[in-house]
Amino acid sequence: MATIPFGYSIHPGDILKSEFMEPLGLSSYRLAKELHVSAPRVNDLVRGKRSITADTALRLSAYFGNSAQFWLNLQNKHDMWVAAKDRSLAKIKPRAKAA
């Protein structure tokens, strides 16, 4: 797996493509057929335009033999990284502790 630069999160679709699909010679179309989902759904995922849902995680885990939690953790890590970049978070003042 490639080294991820500090402060950068890879989209789970990139990991799906580079670590699972490419080594097996799987196209988006073929994976979609194996998962019983639409080809645009898988294509959008590997292009970073769609998130991994619980349903998708279950399908991927059933096909690749890993856990659904693996896929959901990848998505959660990416979502947290994206959300943490929101500059409005810095404007939030902590609530004062009760005396």
Predicted segments, located by residue:
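Intrinsically disordered, low-complexity and often Lys/Arg-enriched segments
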Residues: M1-I4, K97-A99
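A short, Lys/Arg-rich alpha-helix, primarily the initiator
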Residues: A2-L26
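The alpha-helix within a helix-turn-helix
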Residues: M21, A32, S61
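Short alpha-helical DNA-recognition segment
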Residues: G25-D44
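The DNA-recognition helices of helix-turn-helix-type DNA-binding domains
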Residues: S38, K49, F64, Q75-H78
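Short, basic-rich loop-to-helix N-cap that marks the start of a DNA-contacting helix
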Residues: K49-A62
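Short, charged recognition helix plus adjacent turn
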Residues: F70-A99
